[in-house]
A protein has these predicted regions:
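Conserved acidic donor-binding segment of nucleotide-sugar-dependent glycosyltransferases
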Residues: 247, 251-260, 267-277
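A charged, aromatic-enriched C-terminal amphipathic alpha-helix characteristic of glycosyltransferases
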Residues: 271-308
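Short His-centered aromatic/hydrophobic patch
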Residues: 31-36, 54
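Nucleotide-activated donor-binding/catalytic signature segment of Leloir-type glycosyltransferases, i.e.
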Residues: 169-197, 202
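Conserved donor-binding/catalytic core segment of Leloir-type glycosyltransferases
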Residues: 77, 111, 116-135, 141-148, ...
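Aromatic "clamp/platform" in nucleotide-sugar-dependent glycosyltransferases that forms part
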Residues: 215
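Short hydrophobic beta-strand element within catalytic cores of glycosyltransferases
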Residues: 209-211, 232-235
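A short, active-site helix/loop in glycosyltransferases that binds the activated sugar's phosphate group
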Residues: 61-67, 71-99, 107-109
């Protein structure tokens, strides 16, 4: 897929990474949240510029930053102002003065458009992510139960969680049963990225909402995808999510853990045809600005220019 611009190499580990880099005499090495490769690069005999890209928002996965040596990296790149703060918080004293460069995530905006199809059915509250405490599937279930009481026809969909252990998967269904939403609950454990636009479009056309209950996000790609496909979002106000765009009817933020507030926000979008129509109009009005800010065809050259400037190539 990447040819002729890139070659993929599999099986690189801490033992063979340094010889591979030395043999190919790379000008620039980019390491994304991988302490194993950082350690490997300590034995390089060549002298490429090394950039560490920081994308994870999970605090325990950021702890490697506190073990960095001054020679481990020349620069940092990350995706949000929030993550700049987390890097500064975790970085060891040895790299406290290293420059941190901001380059927001980009996507192919042509993959995320409202698909004008007939999607008959009840409203859907969509939830996307891994089945874990960080994404907080339990909060989604609790909010869904509250919504169901006021809007009994609404369906509740999870997309993701393919790697969920069987025991945890059983717990998900048992929770749906206990909360009285099992008949409205749907779980699609894997949807290919190029099909997600259709999911967002279905939710939008049925007057639904994308609900986010996450405890932390370094950027919020699923939120951006949803907005580009004209699907409104109700989200916990965590991490970098507030940086994506200004809040409005189509992008509402609630304090993490506020089940009642998030329930009311969702119901406000689900129960009013007039409010839904107004929200769709507002979403259409910001699409061009989102594309200009995040579209890969517009922004990717800026990332390349940044690498060239940092690598001194």
């Amino acid at each position: 897929m990447l040819s002729p611009f890139a070659t993929l190499h599999f099986g690189l580990d801490e033992n063979n990474t340094a010889p591979f880099i030395d043999n190919n005499e790379f000008d620039l090495v980019i390491i994304i949240d991988s302490e194993e490769y950082i350690r490997a690069c300590r034995s390089l005999t060549t002298n490429p510029k090394i950039i560490i890209e920081v994308h994870t928002s999970i605090e325990r996965n950021l702890e490697y930053l506190g073990r960095l040596k001054a020679s481990d990296t020349d620069y940092f790149i990350t995706v949000s102002e929030y993550m700049i703060g987390r890097i500064n918080h975790h970085n060891s004293d040895s790299v406290k003065n290293h420059q941190i460069h901001l380059f927001e995530n980009v996507l192919d905006s042509t993959l995320f458009e409202l698909e004008q199809q007939n999607f008959p059915g009840p409203p859907v509250v969509l939830w996307i992510g891994k089945i874990d405490d960080h994404k907080d599937w339990k909060a989604f279930m609790e909010i869904s139960s509250n919504i169901s009481t006021a809007s009994p026809d609404t369906e509740f969909w999870i997309v993701g969680g393919q790697t969920c252990p069987e025991e945890l998967a059983q717990q998900v269904f048992e929770t749906a049963e206990e909360l009285g939403i099992i008949n409205q609950f749907r779980w699609f454990d894997r949807v290919e990225n190029n099909n997600m636009s259709q999911v967002y479009s279905l939710v939008s056309c049925r007057g639904g909402v994308n609900l986010v209950t996450s405890h932390g996000e370094s950027f919020g790609m699923a939120v951006l995808e949803s907005l580009l496909a004209n699907c409104p979002v109700v989200s916990s106000d965590v991490g970098a999510l507030s940086e994506i765009t200004e809040t409005a009817s189509y992008f509402q933020l609630y304090e993490l853990g506020d089940i009642e507030k998030s329930t009311q926000m969702c119901l406000g979008l689900l129960n009013s045809t007039e409010a839904h129509a107004s929200t769709m109009k507002d979403l259409n009005s910001i699409r061009a600005s989102l594309i200009n800010r995040y579209c890969s065809s517009i922004r990717s050259s800026g990332y390349w220019d940044l690498l060239i400037s940092l690598g001194g190539v």
